[in-house]
Amino acid sequence: GIYLPSNPCDFIKRLKEPEFKADIIEPEEEKLLLTKAERSKANWLKLAIMLGVDCGMRRGEIIKLRRENVNFINATATLLETKNGTSRSIGLSPRVISEMRKLPINIDGRVINCPSNDNFQHFYSQLQRWTGVKKSFHTTRHTFASRCAMNGWSIAEISAQGGWKNLSILKRYTHIKATYLSEKLAN
């Protein structure tokens, strides 16, 4: 072996993780997005936003969701193709079930008639321009996690619904406002 009098990497400083920008979709922004989405050529866009905000679903999970994996009676869905490769069952909100029933049944069995992530992004970007709401679709998951936390859901419940395997990642998604905390202290 080669003898080195000191570690040549001693002078290298470890990079810090960048500060994470907390962002959620405010209720008035959500209302605007849903209203304009209803007028979009993409008849599935309103449902997609609801699935993100109400159910914490990822874009890819929404695109791949099949009608045969939705239980309308129990208001649940089984997501077979998820980001981390494990399937999970989730609850669906009443307004998601209602909106889902309005959409036509697609020949290929998918709940939304969107062929790809690119197509999804095209219509969502168009919606951002129409509304002036510059928050990414992924922000719907932050919104979901934050609202659930403020509504008293346990970490286990939020994690099970949203598919987070790592508590530190889930923590990055949950943004509790100071005004909410002050209201809790007042009660």
Spans of features found by a protein language model:
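Catalytic-site neighborhood detector that most strongly recognizes the C-terminal catalytic loop/helix
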Residues: 20, 24, 81-85, 95, ...
